[in-house]
Design a protein with these regions (language model features):
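Hydrophobic anchor at the beta1->P-loop junction of P-loop NTPases
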Residues: 6
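P-loop (Walker A) phosphate-binding loop of NTP-binding proteins
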Residues: 9
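ATP-dependent small-molecule kinase phosphotransfer cores
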Residues: 37-110
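Walker A/P-loop
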Residues: 15
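ATP-binding Walker
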Residues: 12
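Small-molecule kinase domains that catalyze NTP-dependent phosphoryl transfer to phosphate-bearing small molecules
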Residues: 96, 126, 147, 151-197, ...
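ATP-dependent NMP and nucleoside kinases share a basic, alpha-helical "lid"
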Residues: 97-106, 112-147
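Short beta-strand-centered segment that lines the nucleotide-binding/catalytic pocket of NTP-utilizing
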Residues: 27-40
Length: 204
């Protein structure tokens, strides 16, 4: 089983690439955002640490963490964002590693993919056999985020500012998928990358 990381800036199309891998290549998806959300629920691995640090002011009436309240704090203060990451990322990474080992033992899938925008910041690349960077021009990403998620320019600016720059991705990862020319082009690029992955495996 190969572990493939899929990363890129917000709105780049990581989920679309992951969906193709699942439907066409029988891959198993590990989504770091989904794990993080589960761990932030009451009783979750990150809940107590986050509430202890940020205070009960971030809670809703039912005791759950209010995502909008927390986001308003961390996206206006980089130090607090870094603190939030330090409280949550190790827990997510631990769960990711656990799932990978379970899938390796089960021998039921050829690929396990990790979808995350924070591949570099969180150290997920070190548990991957290879990492694919999904690249989409920023202007197109902004258009998608406004159209499909209803984000404002201010929200987009804050998120992009706190993610790795395109130059960092290009320096770190040499397997790039260009998502600017339709789904058929994505299919083609994924097939080529998987062919190379298979060839490398056959020679090892």
């Amino acid at each position: 089983m190969k572990v493939i990381g899929i990363t890129g800036g917000i709105g780049s199309g990581k989920s679309l690439v992951a969906d193709i891998m699942i439907k066409k290549h029988n891959a198993y998806l590990i989504n770091s955002d989904t794990i993080a959300r589960e761990q932030m629920k009451p009783g979750g691995a990150s809940y107590k640490g986050v509430v202890d640090y940020f205070g009960e002011g971030i809670l809703s009436g039912d005791g759950t963490i209010d995502k909008e309240k927390l986001s308003a704090i961390v996206f206006s203060d980089r130090e607090k964002l870094l603190k939030l990451n330090s409280l949550t990322h190790p827990n997510v990474l631990k769960e990711v590693q656990k799932i990978i080992e379970e899938k390796r033992r089960s021998k039921t899938v050829p690929y396990c993919i990790i979808e995350t925008a924070l591949m570099i910041e969180s150290g997920y690349d070190f548990v991957c056999d290879e990492v694919w960077y999904v690249h989409t021009p920023e202007c197109e990403r902004r258009k998608r985020l406004k159209q499909y998620r209803g984000y404002s320019d201010e929200q987009i600016d804050a998120i992009i500012r706190n993610q790795s720059r395109e130059e960092d991705f290009f320096k770190r990862f040499d397997k790039v998928i260009y998502n600017d020319d339709g789904i058929w082009r994505l299919d083609e690029q994924i097939d080529k990358l998987l062919d190379k992955t298979t060839q490398i495996s056959d020679t090892q």
